[in-house]
Amino acid sequence: MRAKVKILKIKTGSFNVFISPRDAEEWKLHPNDLVKIESGKRSIYASVAIGDFIEDGEVGLSQDILSSYQFSEGEVVSITPSGTPESVKYIKKKMKGEKLRKVEIETIIRDIVDRKLRNTEISAFITAIEINGLSMDEIAALTIAMAETGDMLDIDRKPIMDVHSIGGVPGNKTNILVVPIVAAAGLTIPKTSSRAITSAAGTADVVEVLTNVKLSLDEIKRIVEKIGACLVWGGALNLAPADDLTIHVERRLSLDPRGLMLASIMSKKYAIGSQYILIDIPTGKGAKVETMDEARTLAKDFIELGKKLGQYVEVAITYGGQPIGYAIGPALEAKEALETLMTGKGPGSLVEKATGLAGILLEMGGVAPKGMGKKVAKEILESGKAYEKMKEIIEEQGGDPNIKPEDIPIGDKTYTIHAQTGGYVTGIDNRAITAIAREAGAPEDKGAGVRLHVKVGEKVKEGDPLITIHAESESRLEKAIVLARRLEPIKIEGMVLQVIGNI
């Protein structure tokens, strides 16, 4: 069957092709049937949709397809019905609780990337993993398959260091300090980061305030081999593409199976050739990982997986019970990170965590003696060497290396919440702070977010400022204020908690 391409200005969220009712009847195709579209050496798989706005002999291609593949208006393509993918039987096997072989996992991942598997089948796969779990051998096979079905980065400068935080703590701009510190010590650290999914700012969102984060693999290779580091958005690259497709479905199901989470993180590291990896697991109330036992178990899994992949992994379990630094939101965090790099001084939680993590990497890379890494990292930060390296990163990625903190625009619609009573700050709700910052417009509105005025343990008087909300519009500010009043993100208590009388 052959048809002419019609470019449609339609986004469906998946790969769909549209045909006319008459062609559907003649070709015996039904809605959601899987078909193969071929033109020359190109071939894609997509689901059928039927619409009377399509002429007979035409095939309409959605923008989802055109964002990944090039087709031109009027181009003639062949359409072939495709049967049930072989990988479906392997998904059923996992649903029964059976262990998958390496080749079966590779087939599933290849079919996800090729779009042979639709969201329904991917949902079944994710649910099967959630219920039955994966062995470490299965996770290793999954990690390698996810990496090898995408692009791989080959950097000549060795050794290649990497750092990754599993997230869950507001204001975690730590890696914007860690990367230039490590690179200034002479090590190689190509850092790919994500945008925010449920947080107020991912590392890529923050760095984008300072410079371009959308680079090609060739550009990354050039920059890293020249200056030893980069800070880029991983989503602009074709690294472990199956990961993005599974995450999209996981979000809808509100599932995050541990095996898939491990493979998701480590597949990106494998794809960029990371040899020494530091995993940061923030732990505490309101973080993704709330207990030390859970953190230790997860740490062991990362280390064991690294061994199977030929990567050396260390894990830092860090305090995650309150935000890092005082700024939450892309521009606010970029400003705080840049100020810290420029002066060598900053919020204690930010400096301590950044130099602590950087110090571990310096020891792993052999440029600092055991037990001296943090001291060396602090010296690099305070000497200005980390700032000079950050300027190089900003310039090489297309930004202004001379950007100053005061040059960064912050949302000018503000509201400050004050203490209703005196006492001590006994808790800061991470999830509430994140929710307020997002309600104010972060991360889409770069200047939106929350500025903390206090931290846990500090004494406050009635009327003292607790948080300032920043927004770029009055409407977003009003919504954030309402939410902040309802959530009460800062908990204040007096030293006397209760008086019990003598009855």
Curated annotation (Swiss-Prot):
Write down the superkingdom of origin. Archaea
> What's the protein called, per UniProt?
AMP phosphorylase
Query: What is any one of the record's Gene Ontology cellular component terms?
Result: cytosol
Sites binding AMP sit at 168, 194-199, 203, 264, 288
Please name the GO terms of the biological process aspect recorded for this protein, alphabetically.
AMP catabolic process; pyrimidine deoxyribonucleoside metabolic process; pyrimidine nucleobase metabolic process
| Catalyzed chemical reaction(s) | AMP + phosphate = alpha-D-ribose 1,5-bisphosphate + adenine; CMP + phosphate = cytosine + alpha-D-ribose 1,5-bisphosphate; UMP + phosphate = alpha-D-ribose 1,5-bisphosphate + uracil
User: Which organism was this protein described from?
Assistant: Pyrococcus horikoshii (strain ATCC 700860 / DSM 12428 / JCM 9974 / NBRC 100139 / OT-3)
Pfam families assigned: Glycos_trans_3N (PF02885), Glycos_transf_3 (PF00591), PYNP_C (PF07831)
Keyword field: Glycosyltransferase, Transferase
